[in-house]
Regions:
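FMN-binding flavodoxin-like domain, especially the glycine-rich phosphate-binding loop
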Residues: 8-12, 19-54, 66-67, 72-97, ...
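Positively charged n-region of N-terminal signal peptides that target proteins for export
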Residues: 1-4
């Protein structure tokens, strides 16, 4: 797991800037993204918080696909629980999510729509079975035009399981 974090730190160059306030903010349905988030948090000494859906997904792949497709088709994103952390206190946000439908998971859409990320540096990291980081990073840039989107890191789910 340390190799995964070191790759992220080298790619972003942000991990060495200790003056900045950092938050690891992530959504994880089955624990894979949480594993990566916790390693980043541990290595950086950053604060950490999970994004949680009010109505959790079941963890069943087919049920998640069915529900996720319906949410996307209707543009009705899942409600999320209020964050406990005050986002205004952070300069750098490591934003983690699994890849769903080629981009970030639906609860992240709700998060992006409900928070002010202006002036923040966002470092995306994702876990995926197929697909990867590029499309979700491009979508983050569109969704958060007033934030700086740094180069992020994508890791295959199978690689996280082996490293844990």
């Amino acid at each position: 797991m340390r190799k995964l974090f070191l790759s992220l730190a080298i790619m972003t160059g942000i991990a060495t800037s200790y003056a900045q306030q950092k938050l690891v903010l992530y959504y994880s349905e089955n624990g894979t993204t949480k594993t990566v988030a916790e390693e980043i948090q541990k290595q950086l000494g950053a604060d950490i918080e999970a994004v949680e859906a009010v109505e959790p997904y079941t963890g069943d792949f087919q049920a998640t696909i069915q529900r996720g497709n319906k949410e996307r088709a209707n543009g009705q994103w899942p409600a999320i629980k209020p964050l406990k952390k005050d986002m205004s206190k952070y300069d750098v946000i490591f934003l983690g999510y699994p890849i769903w439908f080629g981009t970030y998971a639906n609860p992240i859409v709700t998060l992006l729509n409900g928070q002010d990320f202006a002036g923040k540096t966002i470092v995306p990291f994702c876990t995926f079975g197929s697909g990867g980081l590029n499309t979700s990073t491009a979508n983050l840039k569109k969704a958060l035009p007033k934030a700086k989107i740094a180069q992020g890191y994508g890791v295959r789910t199978a690689r996280v399981a082996k490293a844990a």
